[in-house]
Amino acid sequence: MGFLTDWLTDWLKGLLIEGIMGNLTGLFDTVNTRVGEIAVQVGTTPAAWKAGVFSLIRQLSETVILPIAGLVLTFVATYELIQLIIEKNNLHDLDYWIFFKWIFKTAAAILILSNTFNIVMAVFDVSQSVIASAAGIVQGSTDISSSMIDTLEASLETMSLGALLGLWLQSFLIHVTMWALNIVIFVIVYGRMIEIYLLTSLAPLPVATLSNRELGSMGQNYLKSLFAVGFQGMLILVCVAIYAVLIQGIATGGDPVGAIWGCVGYTVLLCFCLFKTGTIARSIFSAH
């Protein structure tokens, strides 16, 4: 009878350990996968991310928004000419060189407006180049090795049946929680790309105001916003890299319960930091 009890206990312990390791392996595999996915997503240019969406946004920008921006530029250029004329003592001290100055500024504004889409894409090409360079370093240093899982499994084999049952229930709950948090991370990363497309679609309107001293703040703030959203990807990559390194620490700590709850705690922290990356990027570039 004692032999049967011992066999049943060992069988249940093995079953629970297998279930716990299945949940934990899924969690740690998600870390590796998430690092790779985010590195790819934030390191992809708008043109390469979704070609169909990019083509639609470009067509809307060039066929719908650009003509309106042309009207805005006409107003800005006319306003600029009036300001240049009346600022010289109401035409009493009029210098004709100001007309050449106005022609040059207007020509430059037209050139910039007609190449708005190329300028916007150049901003994101610069930011994605920086992100791509950093992604290789991050991806190579944050992978979680299988030896960490083996160390964790060895510590589980020394635990009692009751402790393993409680730990299995906790691991299952945390597995579901991590799945939900991964959806949140997905929304944040993809939401950034949607924001890039939205900014790109209306690009000609603020760019049309750049040539004017008084109205140019709109265009300047728009360019700051472009750089902020572009380099937000770098901050997202840094957050995920820090997260993966922290996960490595708890995976080798030898405390299964602490490893599980530490994993979910760090994931909640990651989601919070990802939400803050947009605010931090805008504050760095002084974008409103």
Which role does the model predict for each range below?
Residues 207-224, 251-253, 282-284:
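Alpha-helical transmembrane segments
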Residues 72-110, 202-216:
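Hydrophobic transmembrane alpha-helix segments characteristic of membrane transport
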Residues 70, 74-86, 236-251:
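Juxtamembrane "helix exit" motif at the C-terminal ends of alpha-helical transmembrane segments
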Residues 60-64, 95-99, 103, 160, ...:
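Hydrophobic, aromatic-rich alpha-helical transmembrane segments
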Residues 1-72:
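Binding/recognition "hotspot" determinant
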Residues 1, 8, 12-23, 95-112, ...:
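Alpha-helical transmembrane segments and their helix-start/interface "positive-inside/aromatic belt" motifs
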